[in-house]
């Protein structure tokens, strides 16, 4: 494989010295960019864009042409795994993702296959290989998956949810069915991420978008336990380099200590967690990624820079910080403001790495 020209992101995740704090943005390939909208229109719809390796590669690279980002992230969706299990994913205008056959009971779970990542999810691996080739070693490529709990919420609710009553009903009334589903998902996600690593992903991230809707005890049993299983099953070395793993539970700031015990390399923080506090609690064990409120990108440039400076000062001197937003960039943010953000992170962080 090509020599990596900028490995700042991978080094920071392993808490090794870097010259400046690396930065990337969740959903950096997305609807805030006019060029993304044009490519998506060319593809026809969102899943067609995900399933076309050349177009998925094009949108992955678009933000890197605009901004000096320190990592590329595979353009895909967390719902590729349930889609490959045969749930019939489709997108309803204004409603987001839906499934034609949601999981309602243990019998439904028993019927679900564990997808072969090189077969049913082969289009994702093709995209990873294509992107790695086109990156030419400029920056590392991040692979990702949704967490078992987060994928299960969509599969049981039949799509997006606000109250999560359907899956919580299963959790409390039929926990066996939910554990069976989560176990199957943990196996599927482990295979899926390992296939991404084999195809060329140089780091992986597990997005637990909905872990924060659980009580502490339920989080341990129904979300963290299964993420821990995945971390245990991942290939951690490829191409002679360590493959760092980041766990991100949105709304999970109160559980950082437990998350750091899983053996992951880094934790993603949302914007509701104080980064100085997070570093005090777990900084001797894991790197931290985050954590500016994505809505801050609506602010004038000077205010964005001020917020970047505050977060950098909060983390302080030394290694183990990857700058990011606390969740995905919003679709109506001015692209220039994202540029201000990225440039400010590099310029203002230098003093913390001397």
Curated annotation (Swiss-Prot):
GO (cellular component) term, any one: cytosol
Keyword Cytoplasm: yes
Recorded catalytic activity of this chain's protein: uroporphyrinogen III + 4 H(+) = coproporphyrinogen III + 4 CO2
Subcellular location: Cytoplasm
Annotated site (Transition state stabilizer): 77
Pathway in which the depicted protein is active: Porphyrin-containing compound metabolism; protoporphyrin-IX biosynthesis; coproporphyrinogen-III from 5-aminolevulinate: step 4/4
Superkingdom as given in the UniProt entry: Bacteria
GO MF terms, alphabetically ordered: uroporphyrinogen decarboxylase activity
Protein family (similarity comment): Belongs to the uroporphyrinogen decarboxylase family.
Stated name of the protein: Uroporphyrinogen decarboxylase
Native source organism of the sequence: Escherichia coli (strain 55989 / EAEC)
């Amino acid at each position: 494989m090509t020599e990596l020209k900028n490995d700042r992101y991978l080094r920071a995740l392993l808490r090794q010295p870097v010259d400046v704090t690396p930065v990337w943005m969740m959903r950096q390939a997305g609807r805030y960019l006019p060029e993304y909208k044009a490519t998506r229109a060319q593809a026809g719809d969102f899943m067609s864009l995900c399933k076309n390796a050349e177009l998925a590669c094009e949108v992955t690279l678009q933000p890197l042409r605009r901004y000096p980002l320190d990592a590329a992230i595979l353009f895909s969706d967390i719902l590729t795994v349930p889609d490959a299990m045969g749930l019939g994913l489709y997108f309803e205008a204004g409603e987001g993702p839906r499934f034609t056959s949601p999981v309602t009971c243990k019998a439904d779970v028993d019927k679900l296959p564990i997808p072969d990542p090189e077969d049913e999810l082969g289009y994702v691996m093709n995209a990873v290989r294509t992107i790695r080739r086109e990156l030419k070693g400029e920056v590392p490529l991040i692979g990702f998956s949704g967490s078992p709990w987060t994928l299960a919420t969509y599969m049981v609710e039949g799509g997006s949810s606000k109250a999560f009553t359907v899956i919580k009903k299963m959790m409390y009334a039929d926990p066996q069915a939910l554990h069976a589903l989560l176990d199957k998902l943990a196996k599927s996600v482990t295979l899926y991420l390992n296939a991404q690593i084999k195809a060329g992903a140089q780091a992986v991230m597990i997005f637990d978008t909905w872990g924060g809707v659980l009580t502490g005890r339920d989080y341990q049993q129904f979300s963290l336990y299964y993420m821990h299983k995945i971390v245990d099953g991942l290939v951690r070395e490829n191409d002679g380099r360590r493959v760092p793993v980041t766990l991100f539970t949105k709304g999970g700031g109160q559980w950082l200590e437990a998350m750091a015990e899983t053996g992951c390399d880094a934790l993603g923080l949302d914007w509701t967690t104080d980064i100085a506090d997070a570093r005090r609690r777990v900084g001797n064990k894991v790197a931290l990624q985050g954590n500016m409120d994505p809505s801050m990108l609506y602010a004038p440039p000077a205010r964005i820079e001020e917020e970047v400076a505050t977060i950098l000062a909060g983390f302080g001197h030394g290694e183990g910080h990857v700058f990011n937003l606390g969740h995905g960039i919003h679709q109506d943010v001015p692209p220039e403001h994202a540029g201000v953000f990225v440039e400010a992170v590099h310029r203002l962080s230098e003093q913390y790495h001397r």
